[in-house]
Design a protein with these regions (language model features):
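Acidic, Ser/Pro/Thr-rich low-complexity regulatory regions
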Residues: 1-175
Length: 175
């Protein structure tokens, strides 16, 4: 596994932790895996992260590690959110997430990202699907569409080139 892909995993874990969507253990597990595979090199912060407990210990160490290897090239928050949406889609299909749990996540994510255009219909249809059965299918279509684009995209620019707001608008209305 390449170092940048490994850092992406850590950045995803940090993003989810900062948003309150995941426990600190995911960052710790990342560091433990680096140790297990003897990939920490001489990086004492990775060793310290592997033994860290709680958000107050984990976040500063994870931030130092990401800063050291990425510098100013940190991943965009929308990109991290998009990759999280892709993870959520898989969890939804596996029955580990529900429309209700997704609504709670999207309700926090949408304003935290400053209301991105690509999240409008997904957030709206998820909220509506809670109470109006006719919105279940439009929600699932949009969820599949957005998640599949983020699964393919290597960055926000690539996603934006693929994303079609008109398509989102068309499939966002019950038939």
């Amino acid at each position: 596994m390449k170092i940048m892909q490994q850092l992406t995993e850590l950045e995803l874990a940090v993003f989810q932790l900062q948003m309150g969507f995941a426990p600190a253990d995911r960052c710790v597990d990342w560091a433990v895996e680096r140790l297990r595979l003897d990939q920490e090199g001489e990086d004492l912060d990775i060793v310290l992260l592997a033994s860290a407990r709680g958000v107050d210990e984990v976040l500063p160490l994870a931030d130092v590690i990401i800063e050291r290897y990425r510098g100013a090239q940190r991943l965009d928050q929308q990109f991290l959110a998009g990759k999280y949406i892709d993870e959520l889609r898989a969890a939804y299909l596996a029955g580990r997430e529900s429309v209700s749990s997704l609504d709670a996540i999207l309700t926090r994510l949408y304003p935290a990202l400053d209301y991105p255009d690509w999240l409008v219909m997904l957030s709206r249809n998820c909220e509506y699907a809670l109470d109006v059965p006719d919105f279940q299918q439009p929600f699932e279509l949009e969820f599949d569409y957005i998640a599949s684009l983020w699964a393919e995209a290597g960055d926000v620019g690539a996603f934006e080139r693929l994303y079609d707001r008109e398509r989102s608008d068309r499939q966002g209305v019950p038939c």
